[in-house]
């Protein structure tokens, strides 16, 4: 799995796999963003001003707000 510092940030992970160690987990991010992060395999438009949500399980830094 990718090193933590190379992962996209996600303030609110809504679903995660249950693996050990924690770094091995992939999650679905509940954040609504202006543009999906690079590597998101399922990016969907949502009906809000800022626009998109990555709906696929990806490696994230959960609980971190993007700068």
Curated annotation (Swiss-Prot):
Pull one GO CC term from this UniProt entry.
Answer: extracellular region
Tell me the Gene Ontology biological-process terms attached to this UniProt entry. negative regulation of endopeptidase activity
- Site feature Reactive bond for trypsin, where: 18-19
Tell me which tissues or organs this protein is expressed in. Expressed in bulb (at protein level).
Write out the transmembrane intervals.
none
What is a GO molecular function of this protein? serine-type endopeptidase inhibitor activity
Keyword Disulfide bond attached: yes
Q: What does this protein do?
A: Serine protease inhibitor. Strongly inhibits trypsin (Ki = 4 nM) and elastase (Ki = 4.8 nM). Also inhibits chymotrypsin with a Ki of 22 nM. Does not inhibit bacterial subtilisin.
Q: Which family does it belong to?
A: Belongs to the Bowman-Birk serine protease inhibitor family.
Q: What is this protein called?
A: Bowman-Birk type proteinase inhibitor A6
Q: Which organism is it from?
A: Hyacinthus orientalis (Common hyacinth)
State the taxonomy lineage: Eukaryota, Viridiplantae, Streptophyta, Embryophyta, Tracheophyta
